[in-house]
Amino acid sequence: MSWDDGSHAKVKKVQLTFDEIIYSIQVTYDGATALQSQLRGSVGPKSAEFTLAPDEYITALSAYGKSLSTQEVITALTFTTNKTSYGPYGTKSGFQISAPEATGKQISGFLGTSGNVLNTIDVHYSPIPTGGTGTGGTGTGTGTGTGTGTGTGTGTGTGTGTGTGTGGTGTGTGTGTGGTGTGTGTGGTGTGTGTGTGTGTGTGTGTGTGTGGTGTGTGTGGTGTGTGTGTGTGTGTGGTGTGTGTGTGSGAQKLEAQGNSTGGTSWDDGSDYDGVTKIYASYGGEGIQYVKFDYVKGGVTKQGVLHGKQQSRQNPREFVINHPDEYLVSVEGWYETVMLGIQFKTNLNTYEVSIYPFEPSTDTKFTLQVQDKKIIGFHGFAGNHVNSIGAYFVPKSSTTPVPSTPLKLTAEGGETGAVWDDGSHDDVKKVYVGQGQDGVAAVKFEYKNGSQVVFGDERGTRTLLGFEEFELESDEYITSVEGYYEKNFGVDTVVTTLIFKTSKNKTAGPFGIVSGTKFEFKKEGYKITGFHGRAGEYVNAIGAYLAPSGTTPLTPATQSQKLEGAGSEAGTLWDDGAFDGVRKVSVGQAQDGIGAVSFVYDKAGQVVEGKEHGKPTLLGFEEFELDYPSEYITAVDGTYDAIFGNEPIVNMLRFTTNKRVSIPFGIGAGTAFEFKKDGQKIVGFHGRAGDLLHKFGVHVAPITK
């Protein structure tokens, strides 16, 4: 059932019931009297409510929704105000929809559809109330003189020079009903000499006599093409002056907007940039709903303005352009009354957003491109959709820059799920892939920055099948990732398969079922250094960061050395990496040997807690804590042995520091080993483990004062 609360003075209170989806919403509004809407939906198992302060307004709404077999449902809601945010309520799954913040606007009402649950939701915007305003009085005065009149509030006017005639609108405080102002009037417009940019028509402000402010004086020259100092004179009535200037232009070539330029409002981002760094776009409804661009100037990122309209049902896309190594060379698109599809082409990639493929019989196609030039800015027309688009071009650099920043490759797969981004690191250390019934359910990655290990978050929702995993050696890196994605019945588009290839000609995978559309992330001479994508109940899309395989680490590593471990090859490989030092050792014993170990390290004065390796038993852990930083481990000795014909396990460990020796953890039996190197201290550990500790090794680094 459709419903519409209408628009009100402001939202006062919001009440929700929910579980994994939103069951109902009920809103109380402020007005002449408080008005409570009907319950939209039905009562769910969980409830929440919040009340806004008198000077607090809802400025944005973020929602998630999904399509079930019989209906669409809202799964999560987050409300943002001018002071804080409330939520999320429900579970973030499915596609994201939003009512974004609009300058000077508040969300003053809601509308949507509901039955037993909340199916859809949209909003009404209205201006945020301000203090009393009005038009200042019209005064009689000279130039910047004062005027008296009757008006409400505060008026603003500017004027320069003197003249006799009708004064400008005043700014200030005066007498009169509602606040008649005395202040600065709008001065005359006259004929004068001005400084301008390029060649154009200028407005002169000066001294004059007459009604409407015509006079003679000094004015500002016109704005034209190029930058320079313009000198000229002009005579104008009602604000028109003519100026002539000379100067050197910026060199940007403006190609006219292509599309339907009769609809929407003109917009122009200008051309005072070095390049484009990010593209935002969305499709839905009749075509491309909006575009937005981020630019860079002198190394500083400048965020552009959204052109078009964000709507409740949208399919947002974001494309990162890795300036200065990557730059836009052309734009292709097709349209009817509004833009239906746009392709942004760089020297490295093609990024596309479209609602329909190009249809020659009905659509008009265009290309914006200039030989040996790149795009540094955009302009066009837009209303509820993007009507047309044009571009500014400048010559490409005569030299090709050496890649200095990682390349971010666009995620492949579906458009639903929440955006996630691990960023770029020195290397990938470990990969976890969890499978589900319809595809890859979850992924998780560990990275290395210098000697520090960075643990990425779990992306997606793991199933009872858990994770499959593989760990790279210290001198090994991922050279390519292959995969497949497809849309299954009743399920959003998901990644179905992942395959990882390394610098040592190893292949991990395929993880999942090979089915659907194939993709690959690979570039000669580059390695994979990070991942990003979209995920909800499944991994909907995945992308990668690439960096030259000889890239200098983001964080210089300690001058450490990895000593080969002692024990067997059973279990799973683990490696904590190298740190500044060890703060605490924890050893858990089992019936037949060492069950598990974990360590606490120090990195630049920060405590770093390592993971447990192995499987703890009911015996728990014994601990050996160091007096860090004055105390450090200089040696580790132990033994390993095969029990009842099984793979050997580590059955004893003992730690020696520059001050003392720990107790032996376990019972020594079998083959003895020791890790020790003159002038070095132990700064990290590695090995192999399953239900027991099968192998143990160390990282060492020079002892420093």
From Swiss-Prot:
Identify the keywords attached in UniProt to this record, alphabetized: Lectin, Repeat
Jacalin-type lectin domain residues = 1-127, 252-395, 406-548, 560-702
**GO MF annotations for this entry?**
carbohydrate binding; copper ion binding
Q: Which GO terms describe its cellular component?
A: cytosol; nucleus; plasmodesma
What the entry lists under InterPro entries is as follows: Jacalin-like_lectin_dom, Jacalin-like_lectin_dom_plant, Jacalin-like_lectin_dom_sf
Q: Please name the Pfam families in this protein's record.
A: Jacalin (PF01419)
Oligomeric state and interaction partners are given as:
Component of the PYK10 complex, at least composed of PYK10/BGLU23, BGLU21, BGLU22, JAL22, JAL23, PBP1/JAL30, PBP2/JAL31, JAL32, JAL33, JAL34, JAL35, GLL22 and GLL23.
Sequence similarity: Belongs to the jacalin lectin family.
The entry's protein name is Jacalin-related lectin 34
Q: Which organism is it from?
A: Arabidopsis thaliana
Q: Highest lineage ranks of the organism?
A: Eukaryota, Viridiplantae, Streptophyta, Embryophyta, Tracheophyta
